[in-house]
């Protein structure tokens, strides 16, 4: 079955045709490890996880590379300001290495909590200085870079086209440029490949241009080429990286080897908070740990993200998370009920399940259309007959969803003994046909934060999520 991705490079949905069908090569821009990753950052990682899983669902083997930026990313996202790592180290009274190790660990803890697969190769910028220097030297040799008193810059005037991914108007930017940070730059859009370090700069390395450190963009180009070659299949990242970072990666690659590094460029949209921007000043910067502290399994956020296509803005609300928590519980309950189900399936039932699987497959292959795919997941979960074959289909879907659908709901394991005792008392009241007592106990259980639901398989106790 064909796969289609919306390609930022071509501005349309393209049929996926791998360079080498035996191995799909992917590069993802990872975190700058100077602070906690937000749930907005994690939304990008969730979409990248779905991409990996979808390719594997289609039978492909994957080589996925993700970088860890631990030097060179300045606060402006350009060539101005302080290195984010150094700023964080100063504010937290730690060394840059301590900052990097701390936030790298937290990042991977969050990936694990969300059941996001770790890429096959994770590479740190500070461990690839040699490759970056060689890359810059080659750009100098090819005539695409020049030296000033402060840095080595990429000369965008040498390119046949810039920008390629975004709709930036370079001529308008030139006309509107009022202040140039470095008057030695030939063009306002020229960007730093390598930055000469002040004497007191903590993170610096020897280079042909003296003690210095890499620019943000050269890191991904050098590491991507090292592990994936001059050209690979897919490059991913957040939509914010299109004009600030990915344009310059393409420029560097064209300058060094004459090629655009990836054939397909996929970008995830922003996360909104209650319809607005996530902002520290508004007090609405949420982390994965905040979801945990509200009493939710972090995977609930992953399921919540599937309510919206990765190329559309997703609006985060705690009400939405509460609804997703209930949905996760229902899906896991359906899996368990089907696993132990004894209903017989007819030939017509089997054909219908096969059609559901085909529809799911078409949905994920259509630019990772998870909202549509989830409609078929629910069709299977609500299948009238309970049979292990339905559980098997749900488990197959979960190889893409990654929501641990076969896991017994943790809420059941955490129900206090007091509630269990009340549930048992209510059960006895019902057996004695004491409906008044039964209703009173139900209301008491509800007041204590739980709902009881009578099903043909017994009593289901559901925690009421509260903000």
Regions found by a protein language model. Name each.
Residues 10, 19-113, 454-457, 461:
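N-terminal, positively charged nucleic-acid-binding surface of large information/translation enzymes
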Residues 56, 140, 446:
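Anion (oxyanion) recognition and catalysis
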Residues 61-63, 143-149, 384, 451-453:
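Short, well-structured beta-strand/strand-turn elements
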Residues 65-71, 100-107, 117-132, 150-159:
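Short, glycine/charge-rich beta-strand/loop segments that flank catalytic centers
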Residues 59, 94-98, 108-134, 144, ...:
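Non-catalytic interaction-recognition regions
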Residues 277-280, 284-467:
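Structural preference for alpha-helix termini/caps and helix-kink/transition segments
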């Amino acid at each position: 079955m064909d796969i289609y991705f919306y390609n930022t490079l071509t501005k349309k949905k393209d049929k996926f045709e791998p360079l080498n069908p035996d191995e799909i090569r992917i590069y993802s821009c990872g975190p700058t490890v100077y602070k906690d990753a937000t749930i907005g950052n994690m939304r990008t990682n969730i979409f990248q996880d779905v991409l990996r899983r979808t390719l594997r669902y289609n039978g492909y083997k994957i080589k996925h590379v993700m970088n860890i930026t631990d030097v060179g990313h300045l606060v402006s996202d350009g060539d101005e300001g302080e290195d984010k790592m150094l700023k964080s180290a100063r504010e937290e009274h730690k060394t840059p290495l301590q900052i990097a190790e701390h936030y790298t660990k937290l990042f991977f803890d969050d990936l694990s909590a969300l059941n996001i697969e770790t890429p096959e190769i994770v590479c740190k910028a500070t461990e690839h200085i040699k490759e970056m220097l060689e890359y810059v030297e080659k750009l100098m040799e090819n005539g695409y870079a020049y030296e000033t008193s402060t840095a080595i810059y990429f000369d965008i005037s040498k390119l046949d086209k810039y920008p390629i991914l975004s709709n930036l108007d370079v001529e308008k930017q030139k006309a509107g440029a009022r202040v140039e940070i470095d008057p030695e730059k030939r063009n306002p859009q020229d960007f730093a490949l390598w930055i000469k370090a002040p004497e007191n700069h903590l993170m610096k390395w020897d280079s042909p241009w003296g003690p210095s450190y890499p620019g943000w963009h050269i890191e991904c180009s050098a590491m991507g080429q090292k592990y994936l070659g001059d050209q690979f299949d897919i490059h991913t990242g957040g939509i914010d990286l299109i004009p600030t970072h990915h344009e310059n990666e393409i420029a560097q690659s064209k300058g060094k080897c004459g090629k655009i590094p990836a054939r397909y460029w996929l970008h995830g949209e922003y996360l909104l908070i209650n319809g607005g921007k996530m902002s520290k000043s508004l007090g609405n910067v949420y982390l994965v740990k905040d979801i945990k502290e509200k009493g939710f399994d972090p995977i609930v956020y992953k399921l919540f993200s599937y309510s919206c296509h990765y190329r559309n803005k997703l609006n985060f609300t705690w009400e939405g998370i509460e609804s997703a928590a209930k949905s996760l519980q229902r899906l896991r309950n359906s899996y368990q009920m089907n696993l132990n189900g004894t209903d017989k399936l007819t030939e017509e039932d089997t054909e219908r399940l096969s059609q559901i699987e085909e529809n799911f497959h078409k949905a994920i292959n259509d630019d990772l259309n998870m909202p549509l795919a989830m409609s078929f997941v629910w069709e299977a979960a609500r299948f009238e007959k309970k049979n292990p074959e339905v559980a098997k289909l749900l488990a197959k879907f979960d190889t893409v969803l990654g929501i641990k659908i076969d896991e017994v709901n943790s809420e059941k394991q955490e129900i206090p003994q007091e509630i269990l005792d009340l549930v048992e008392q209510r059960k006895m009241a019902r057996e004695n046909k004491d409906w008044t007592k039964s209703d009173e106990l139900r209301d008491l259980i509800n007041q204590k934060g739980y709902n009881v639901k009578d099903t043909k398989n017994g009593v289901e106790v559901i925690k009421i999520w509260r903000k």
